[in-house]
Amino acid sequence: SLLHRADAGNMSGIGLTMEGINQNPFIFALMLENVWQDTPVDVDAFLGDYLSCRYGLKDAAPDVKSGITRSWKTLVNSVYSNHTDADGGRQSVMTKRPVFASGPDSLQKPGNFFPLDSLVTAWDGMMNCAGALSGSDGFRYDLVDVTRQVLVELLDRLHYESQEAFYSSDSRMFIQRSSEVLSLMHEIDDLLATRKEFLLGPWVEAAKALGTTPEEKSLYEWNAKTQITLWGKPGSPLNDYACKN
């Protein structure tokens, strides 16, 4: 009814401009679905339609449909169900400024608002469907993204254990965990390099393409790089605001 009002003018719909980098397509699809609803969205029904369209499940075997749906319901009820008062997501050692606990009393165990075993269960289910759904680009992206999160959670725990070993004077464990942290960082980087959505080059070039003059292109390039690094000029009070994990 809003679109057909006499005073609608040039309105043709509603969109989103996020402080983000095109991640979590499920959340934004759900948000836009909710815009035109008078009642709360039936998430289970929406999820079924979403997965059918995103992964092309029309001709998929029943066990594949049920398996991938079960994985996503696990994600919806854990990763996508934050009922805490936390402001923003938890930062990971992978993306925030390098930090090492100043002492044993300042050590903080990594944690999240969702149980890690739920994330791993969802990931395992997706892996079981990988052979059948490998032809879906949407599935391949989601599998990389969920795998990334699983590995990042592991990385943070290894980083914590390296600090714990340091302050326990356990040099052998400190060296082992530190080596594992650095190795896993490279593995996560290799994983993300399989998708253009996680590469710096396409991100910067897409921003530059919006410019019509050399000056505009340079400005947009600066903004694109700033958004994923300092988020402002050097000395900005925003600490790690660009962290996008």
Residue positions per predicted region:
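Substrate-binding groove of N-acetylhexosamine-processing glycoside hydrolases
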Residues: 1-245
